[in-house]
């Protein structure tokens, strides 16, 4: 099993759960860890929200003792605030600090944050170097192919990130303009790999063990980041590990296994978020878990009326 070293942190394997707002919360990360994910990326956290002691941010910062190694992702555009807030949270039990330079969401981009930073190489350097100087933990950065077709500069930005002292860079093979549409351009990941000597983590359209193998062959990347490919599919990590070790694909989980995983996920949601929020958040997860299963469209419709764990359990046992 190939390991991956990021700064002074050694990951047990190269398969990384990518950060997804509203998805990679503590309950989901625990499930992915149990399936063997080598690194778990938390939901992005606003550096300004930490500065202003936003109460909702505290729950985003919660880490389970069993989930290391884990990466905490900041977003922002002010080097001073970002570095000072990184220092403020450094004592928490995360292993790696990541900087979000890939988020395509309009309200983030309008503030000059997320993927908007791809248009400002000078500020990229200032943010990364300030963060690296502020904390002892490794700093990584997640970027995109570029902002749009007129600004494809992942290679240039990756070099700046390396010069500023980052320990690794993750590259999503789409521009901000593309969001998640079309196909990810893996060739840009190869170009970044050739441009820098720090580890490069490839991201985009990795939905199976074969795709992960293909990504490594095409790009030479050091790590593989799985984001949407893990939605409703925490098994993807154990499947990738088995495939790397044996060259064979394990059987996909059957209906009963999917149902058991959903109920375990729901119990974790309730434990950390209470029934009201936990059950509502499970609705989207159930839609992902059951995608492609017979009768899943009807189930998704019914799930939106479920208000309690008991109702969820009864419905899943009826339908699956």
Regions found by a protein language model. Give the residues of each.
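Glycine-rich, positively charged N-terminal anion/phosphate-binding segment
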Residues: 1-5, 20-95
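Alpha/beta catalytic cores of nucleotide-metabolism and tRNA/nucleoside-modifying enzymes
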Residues: 1-3, 11, 15, 21, ...
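N-terminal small/glycine-rich loop or linker at the start of catalytic domains
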Residues: 2-16, 50-70, 103, 107-111, ...
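Hydrophobic faces of well-ordered beta-strands that scaffold small-molecule active sites
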Residues: 15-19, 40-42, 70-74, 97, ...
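Active-site beta-loop-alpha junctions enriched in small/polar residues
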Residues: 20, 45-47, 75-77, 102-104, ...
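Short secondary-structure transition/capping segments
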Residues: 51-56, 109-112, 152-153, 181-184, ...
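Alpha/beta enzyme core
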Residues: 83-113, 122-198
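Aromatic- and acidic-residue-enriched carbohydrate-binding clefts of CAZyme catalytic domains
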Residues: 118
């Amino acid at each position: 099993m190939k390991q991956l070293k990021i700064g002074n942190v050694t990951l047990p394997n190269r398969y990384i759960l990518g950060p997804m707002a509203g998805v990679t919360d503590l309950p989901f990360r625990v499930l992915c860890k149990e399936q063997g994910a080598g690194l778990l990326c938390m939901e992005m956290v606003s550096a300004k929200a930490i500065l202003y002691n936003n109460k909702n941010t505290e729950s985003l910062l919660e880490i389970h003792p069993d989930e290391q190694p884990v990466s905490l992702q900041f977003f922002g555009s002010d080097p001073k605030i970002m570095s000072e807030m990184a220092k403020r949270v450094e004592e928490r039990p995360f292993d790696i600090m990541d900087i979000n330079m890939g988020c395509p969401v309009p309200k983030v981009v309008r503030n000059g944050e997320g993927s908007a930073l791809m248009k400002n190489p000078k500020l990229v350097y200032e943010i990364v170097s300030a963060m690296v100087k502020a904390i002892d933990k490794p700093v990584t950065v997640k970027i995109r192919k570029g902002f749009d077709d007129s600004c494809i500069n992942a290679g240039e930005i990756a070099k700046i990130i390396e010069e500023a002292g980052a320990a690794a860079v993750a590259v999503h093979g789409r521009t901000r303009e593309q969001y998640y549409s079309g196909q990810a351009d893996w060739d840009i990941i190869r170009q970044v790999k050739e441009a820098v000597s720090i580890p490069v983590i490839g991201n985009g359209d990795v939905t199976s063990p074969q795709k992960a193998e293909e990504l490594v062959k095409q790009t030479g990347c050091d790590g593989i980041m799985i984001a949407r490919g893990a939605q409703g599919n925490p098994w993807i990590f154990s499947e990738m590990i088995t495939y790397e070790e044996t060259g064979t694909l394990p059987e996909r989980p059957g209906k009963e296994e999917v149902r058991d995983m959903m109920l375990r996920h729901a119990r974790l949601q309730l434990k950390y978020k209470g029934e009201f929020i936990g059950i509502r958040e499970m609705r989207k997860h159930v839609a992902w878990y059951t995608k492609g299963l017979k009768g899943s469209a009807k189930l998704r419709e019914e799930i939106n009326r479920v208000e309690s764990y008991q109702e969820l359990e009864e419905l899943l046992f009826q339908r699956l």
